Each structure stands twice: as structure tokens, then as C-alpha cells.
């Protein structure tokens, strides 16, 4: 019952935000919950482990143009399924909008599928809080972060 209520709350809160992104030439990345383990101030680094690579571009939903120097905060469960400072990072997209991050495959956390949390920020755009869900058996993925311009 509690899981159902949580899902309903997510749909109500984030569904409205997702609908606000409709009509853009570049579909915005869907928002997702930040969860209870976010902590600001993660060290600037692009690697917290090896075995899984996440790459992509930060883009504008308005015209699909790339956004350089966007701040991306990342956190994930460690191999043992526990969150900790060793599994947190802050990185920035390159001038061409691209980013790359290396980690281990996140360990199991409760009944949740393996996932990586991300927050993307850039001047002139709404903050994006989302999650990347790993496909089983993969060693990497491309995950673009498409941001909605400020009103």
C-alpha cells in the first residue's frame, strides 16, 4: 500500500513537471525522485569505480543545442548496496556538452533496480533531478540530460 501511495505521489508531482516539457523540439529528460541519500558538496571527479560507463550530452529542450559547463551531481549505491561518500561525484559537461562518468554497477538497494541518481544544473535552465536505470548485463549506456529553459 505504501509503495502504491509513493508511486502516486511521484506521478502527481513529477507528472506535472513532465507535462510542462511537452512541445519542445528536444524531448526533456523525465524527472525522477532524488531519494533520501542526496548530499551536496560531492568532490569533483569523473570516476568512483570501474565496470560501468555513463556518457551523454547536456542539451537544451528548446532547440537541442548543447549546454557546456553544466554541473552534474551523481550518487549511487556502492557494490554492497549502501550509499556513501565514496560513491558521489560532481562533474561538468565539456564545452561541447558531453560528459563521461565511470563507476561500478550499483549494488542492490532494497527492491529497487540498479540505478544512478543525477542532478543537472545550468544557468538559464530548470534544475533536472533524474535517475538512470541500468539495463541488466550492460557495461555502459548513453544518457542525455535534456534541460527545460527557465520561464
How would you name each of these model-derived features?
Residues 16-20:
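Sec/Tat signal peptide C-region and signal peptidase I cleavage site
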Residues 1-5:
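Bacterial N-terminal signal peptides that target proteins for export
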Residues 6-15:
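Bacterial N-terminal signal peptides
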Residues 21-151:
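Beta-strand-dominated extracellular/periplasmic modules and repeats
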Amino acid at each position: 500500500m505504501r509503495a502504491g501511495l509513493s508511486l502516486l505521489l511521484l506521478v502527481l508531482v513529477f507528472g506535472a513537471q513532465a507535462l510542462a516539457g511537452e512541445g519542445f523540439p528536444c524531448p526533456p529528460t523525465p524527472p525522477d525522485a532524488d531519494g533520501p541519500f542526496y548530499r551536496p558538496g560531492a568532490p569533483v571527479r569523473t570516476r568512483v569505480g570501474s565496470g560501468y560507463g555513463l556518457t551523454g550530452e547536456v542539451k537544451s529542450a528548446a532547440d537541442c543545442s548543447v549546454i557546456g559547463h553544466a554541473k552534474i551531481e551523481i550518487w549511487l549505491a556502492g557494490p554492497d548496496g549502501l550509499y556513501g561518500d565514496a560513491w558521489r561525484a560532481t562533474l561538468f559537461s565539456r564545452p561541447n556538452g558531453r560528459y563521461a562518468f565511470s563507476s561500478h554497477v550499483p549494488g542492490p538497494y532494497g527492491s529497487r533496480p540498479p540505478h544512478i541518481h543525477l542532478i543537472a544544473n545550468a544557468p538559464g535552465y530548470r534544475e533536472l533531478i533524474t535517475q538512470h536505470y541500468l539495463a541488466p548485463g550492460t557495461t555502459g549506456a548513453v544518457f542525455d540530460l535534456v534541460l527545460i529553459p527557465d520561464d
